[in-house]
Amino acid sequence: MKTKKPIKPYYRFNNEVLKSLDENWTRASDHAKILTVDNQKTIKGAKYGYKTLGIHFAPFTLSGQNICPWASKGCAAACLNTAGRGIFESIQKARIKKTQDFQTNRNKFLARLYREISNEIRAAEKAKIKLAFRLNLTSDLQFEKIALNHKSEQSIIHTFKDIQFYD
């Protein structure tokens, strides 16, 4: 009989982690998902056995604030914001809302992102698949320098140190 390998503690969304997150945290099910799966930028990893998830923000100043502070002119010209389903108004509105949520209530946004990543890790372990995350699908943010919350200097990327993140 096989024994189940326990999930590593920093993958769990337990009371200790909840206490360290924003007090105004709300359940992820109350909002649209932050992470996107299966788009033109992420499906390429599937042939290598990876399920890749990422975040689509409204790039540049589409949300009212610049989410691509380090983007080059070439990046702006080649931006895939309106590629595929991005052409639809409802998708653009969702990306703008997601970007505004990130800018106005970062602690709550990052708490929701933490929960989504934790859930994906548990599902991937159960399904025995590999995960990768690309948090800058249509943005140019330094997630490795953004603290998970106001009580921690650790970023979301450093919290999940055994998971593949790429830009």
Label every model-predicted segment.
Residues 1-166:
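Class I S-adenosyl-L-methionine
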